[in-house]
Amino acid sequence: MLSNLMSWQITLPIALAAAIIGYLFGSIPFGLILTRAAGLGDVRSIGSGNIGATNVLRTGNRTLAAATLLLDALKASAAAWVVSYFLGEEAAIIAGFFAFIGHLFPVWIGFKGGKGVATYIGTLLGVAPIMVVLFAAVWLAVAFTTRYSSLSALVAMLVIPVALWILGNEKVAAVMAIMTLISYWKHKANISRLMGGTESKIGAKG
């Protein structure tokens, strides 16, 4: 799979342009913007301190959490679509990857962002949209059987690169595999709680 990262035809200037565009799109902290606009203060001061949809949900506003999830996904998709139109498909993959990085490490708020599940999905939507259906199916299956949201996302992110590789989309598979590893690192606290049996389940109170 790693050999496919060396077989790209994209030029360095185009790759850099795609990376910058993607990173700037991904750095938009929608969770923080929406909660402040709604008069709910700084989402970083509650729960996990994360700017993603899961932490926004801890404000008690489901609409804002859903909007955050949607916008965090669409910023990666938009970066990929815009770059694909002007710079080509390989550049779009790079833009999606760096939108993911931008969400995790946003320049505007001290490089402290979310865990990247929504932007992972958004990148898929931008470069391999049919895989979003598989991601959703795996997430729902695991969530239904275990009621762990974090585990559902982790399993889905593990399945996606394998499925892409089997289907012959090896460049996207390689990039998504790297994104999966990074997201696993960002989820290390969740993984520790899952292993210890202390991770919160979907619908759990308190």
From Swiss-Prot:
Known pathway: Lipid metabolism; phospholipid metabolism
Sorted UniProt keywords: Cell inner membrane, Cell membrane, Lipid biosynthesis, Lipid metabolism, Membrane, Phospholipid biosynthesis, Phospholipid metabolism, Transferase, Transmembrane, Transmembrane helix
Pfam families: G3P_acyltransf
Keyword Lipid biosynthesis: yes
Family, as annotated: Belongs to the PlsY family.
NCBIfam families to which the protein is assigned, alphabetical: glycerol-3-phosphate 1-O-acyltransferase PlsY (TIGR00023)
Protein name: Glycerol-3-phosphate acyltransferase 1
The species this protein was found in: Rhizobium johnstonii (strain DSM 114642 / LMG 32736 / 3841)
